[in-house]
């Protein structure tokens, strides 16, 4: 697989070519994903739940993400590698720069941060200092205590309009990817259409430029709960490599997620 950059994703968006992405946490699975030419991997703070056994992502530290970023980069030298910035690691622009630098040195090509237009100054500071940013909107798991649980976001018109404005503001500030989680498919389509940057969805219908799944959900090995928008591709294939290939094939064809795996 050739080295993937943000320019490839932008070109694919312009061409209408959909792409699949996944979380990854170690070198072995990263190597598996690279063998199937998975273009983008995310070292997600979801590791707090699927690896550390926590109830949410809040306990994850920058050091945790940096460690797993090094592991994933070792297994997948050519993917575009995103790394989550954990809870309260970007409370100020200055703090964000310091912590993002640690993740970039660990091998990330981009950092992902959760939140709306209040992050504009942070995104500007990061991108002006050569740190690419993915902006995460919708259900932002680090805000679980504000939301009162993991709930669909943007269902009413006012909140939907606000999310569109947030997405445009973050793009203007320099965000190069927007990730939408658990938002109505109609809203995801609207945001995907108005943005020039690639939009990745999870639980947001099949209209976004890309899709992402938590690796453990894709393989049906999550310990407690399988979200409705996820699909066990391993159950259909009986082989992990074939499962990854099937996931990528269905995303590229626009057949995943289908209605059964769309939550709103």
From Swiss-Prot:
Free-text remark on how the cofactor is bound: Binds 1 Mg(2+) ion per subunit.
InterPro entries: Pantoate_hydroxy_MeTrfase, Pyrv/PenolPyrv_kinase-like_dom, Pyrv_kinase-like_dom_sf
UniProt keyword annotation of Thylakoid present: no
Database matches in Pfam families: Pantoate_transf (PF02548)
Residues annotated as binding Mg(2+): 45, 84, 114
One record GO biological process: pantothenate biosynthetic process
Catalytic activity line of the entry: 3-methyl-2-oxobutanoate + (6R)-5,10-methylene-5,6,7,8-tetrahydrofolate + H2O = 2-dehydropantoate + (6S)-5,6,7,8-tetrahydrofolate
Record keywords: Cytoplasm, Magnesium, Metal-binding, Pantothenate biosynthesis, Transferase
Keyword hit for Metal-binding: yes
Gene Ontology molecular function: any one: 3-methyl-2-oxobutanoate hydroxymethyltransferase activity
Catalytic residues (UniProt): 181
This protein's name: 3-methyl-2-oxobutanoate hydroxymethyltransferase
Organism: Vibrio vulnificus (strain YJ016)
């Amino acid at each position: 697989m050739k080295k993937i950059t943000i320019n490839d994703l932008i070109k694919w968006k312009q061409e209408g070519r959909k792409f699949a992405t996944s979380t990854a946490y170690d070198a072995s699975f990263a190597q598996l994903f690279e063998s199937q030419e998975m273009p983008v991997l995310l070292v997600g703070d979801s590791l707090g739940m699927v690896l550390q056994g926590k109830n949410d992502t809040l306990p994850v530290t920058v050091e945790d993400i940096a460690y797993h970023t090094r592991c994933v980069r070792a297994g997948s030298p050519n993917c575009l590698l995103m790394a989550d910035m954990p809870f309260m690691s970007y409370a100020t622009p200055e703090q964000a720069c310091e912590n993002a630098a640690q993740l970039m040195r660990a091998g990330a090509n981009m950092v992902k941060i959760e939140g709306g237009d209040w992050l504009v100054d942070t995104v500007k500071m990061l991108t002006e200092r050569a740190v690419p940013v993915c902006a995460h909107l919708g259900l932002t798991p680090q805000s679980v205590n504000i939301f009162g649980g993991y709930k669909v976001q943007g269902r009413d018109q006012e909140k939907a309009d606000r999310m569109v404005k947030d997405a445009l503001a973050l793009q203007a500030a320099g965000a190069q990817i927007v990730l939408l989680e658990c938002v109505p498919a109609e809203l995801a389509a609207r945001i995907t259409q108005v943005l020039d940057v690639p939009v990745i969805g999870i639980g947001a219908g099949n209209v976004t430029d890309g899709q992402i799944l938590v690796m453990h959900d894709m393989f049906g090995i999550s310990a407690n709960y399988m979200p409705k928008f996820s699909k066990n591709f391993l159950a259909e294939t009986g082989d992990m490599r074939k499962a990854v290939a099937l996931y990528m094939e269905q995303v590229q064809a626009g057949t995943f997620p289908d209605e059964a795996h769309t939550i709103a």
